[in-house]
């Protein structure tokens, strides 16, 4: 992981200096991501700087643009390695996060990681298009996030039924 000072500077650059207080948990996330990525393909970007800038900072940018209410429920569609939902949960511990992914092995990674990081989160093993049609999940979330899931038209069809 990049140094604490570099992380503080990065968080200041994206206008979210409060996230810098979670440096230790972001560092643990980075280490675990790199270790798990050797066993299963979670991401192509695994170098310390790339993880900090392209994964963590990019995932946190929406928090600087949208005011989510305290305690908002967030579904992270196609969670994969946890981006953007887990960095958002680290920066905003009041968010109620559900990770939705079609592959159980990714959810296993996220379940173990969220436990290590002390982040309460729900895991939903499903395809987004199916979850959106399920009464248990349809219109149950305040906000949906996704990253590298589908083109915008398809992504809207996956996410809109959930919020």
Regions found by a protein language model. Name each.
Residues 2-70, 75, 105-108, 112-120:
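Class I SAM-dependent transferase core
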Residues 78:
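Conserved glycine-centered beta->alpha loop in an early N-terminal alpha/beta scaffold
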Residues 81-94:
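Conserved SAM-binding loop of SAM-dependent methyltransferases across substrates and taxa
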């Amino acid at each position: 992981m990049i140094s604490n000072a570099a992380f503080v500077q990065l968080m200041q650059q994206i206008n979210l200096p409060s996230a810098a207080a979670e440096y230790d948990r972001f560092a643990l996330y980075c280490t675990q991501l790199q270790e798990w990525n050797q066993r299963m393909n979670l991401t192509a970007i695994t170098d310390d700087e790339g993880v900090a800038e392209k994964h963590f900072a990019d995932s946190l940018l929406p928090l600087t643009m949208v005011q989510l209410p305290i305690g908002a429920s967030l579904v992270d569609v196609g969670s994969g390695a946890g981006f953007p939902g887990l960095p958002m949960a680290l920066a905003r511990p009041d968010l109620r996060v559900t990770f939705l992914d079609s592959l159980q092995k990714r959810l296993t990674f996220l379940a173990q990681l969220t436990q290590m990081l002390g982040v309460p989160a729900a895991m939903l093993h499903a395809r987004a298009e199916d979850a959106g049609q399920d009464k248990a999940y349809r219109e149950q979330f305040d906000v949906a996030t996704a990253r590298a899931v589908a083109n915008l038209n398809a992504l809207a069809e996956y996410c809109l039924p959930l919020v």
